[in-house]
Amino acid sequence: MSTGRAAPLPLSVLDLAPISAGSSPAEAIRNSIALARAAEEWGYRRFWLAEHHFVAVGSSSTATLIALVAAATQSIRVGSAAVQLGHHSAASVVEAFGTVDAVFPGRLDLGLGRSGQRRTELLDAARTPTAQRPSAEPERVVDGLLLPQPFAAAEVVSSPLIGATAAALEFDGAIQPDFGDAVCDVLAFLDGGLRVGDVELHAVPGEEADVQVWVFGSSKGQSAQVAGAEGLPFVANYHVSPATVLEAVDAYRAHFRPSARLSRPYVVVSADVVFADNDSEATHLASTYGHWVHDIRTGRGAQPYLDPTTASPLTAEQRAVVDDRIRTQFVGSPSTVAERLDTLARVTGADELVITSVTYDLEDRLRSHQLLAAEWGLTDSSR
């Protein structure tokens, strides 16, 4: 924070290009570009874009949007958070990012995630009788950081939308590679080529592109382990799975082996933040976040983000589905909430925080990031 940190921990932005109720994908994309320009001015290190399909966000074609953002900015790093390797081949990913890197060299972060492949595991878990499932960890507070009881994602992952999405994005009969193998294929294409049988394939463009590879994960499972074993930086998703953030970073560090890319573990932790000039305003702006998460968790996917001035409050039953996410949001004025972000960084040992903020109006999203940049001490011009 600006009041005590001589060298502030770097902050980055994770943007979903959310579509607000009554708005359009085109406006959401323009808003993301505007936010990226502002983030660069305010001293944020990176601007990352999520990949989601067939829902009310504008970032489905992540590499395309990354190129648009890179063209609209000068120096901020731009990347994916994360490419869903279950829906893309390693070759297509490297060629896409290599193409953008050819025009904007040295500015791209290639974040890789397991979506698509992980769905099969969750479906298997959903089919397991409740009595045979491991009991959930109880809620706890570790050195000031809230770790709520884990959400049972297996209960909703079998929704028709998720199944239809997989069917639309994957070829019939295609066998998805193991996530670790897919990551290694990406690295091979970037480093000099991938041998398939007796043929060595070279990604053009893509080979030797100046792209930094990241792995995203929410638990102590394969993503954290692969990131560590391959010597890659790791992003732990506190904003999506707050209950498991510590086990994720611990597993990553335990499996870490130095590589040509990274000599020591590097951890980024995500946080969902809504800052405003006072606590009551911030609470009002964040009041429809629970509605948005509820749609996602009950299988409808992200719907247009509701206007807090007209939306009805969540019912008690709806609130129970999203309670962990609401209570682990960082909502308020900078003076009352920034210390909680400091706690998140300290307890997880994060080298960097990545901030996501979803509000109905772009102006409120911009103001949230601006206030945080000023409070954190990223730049004197943030206030």
PLM regions and their residue ranges:
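N-terminal beta1-alpha1-beta2 module of alpha/beta enzyme domains
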Residues: 1-78
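An alpha-helical appendage that flanks or caps ligand/catalytic pockets
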Residues: 2-7, 130-204, 243-348, 380-383
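Conserved, mostly hydrophobic/aromatic
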Residues: 11, 39, 43, 51, ...
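Active-site mouth loops of central-metabolism enzymes
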Residues: 15-30, 60, 82-91, 207-219, ...
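Hydrophobic faces of well-ordered beta-strands that scaffold small-molecule active sites
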Residues: 11-15, 47-49, 77-81, 108-112, ...
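A generic, well-ordered mixed alpha/beta core segment in the N-terminal half of proteins
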Residues: 89-137
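Short, acidic/polar
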Residues: 26-38, 218-225, 334-343
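A conserved active-site cap/scaffold subdomain adjacent to cofactor or substrate pockets
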Residues: 222-243
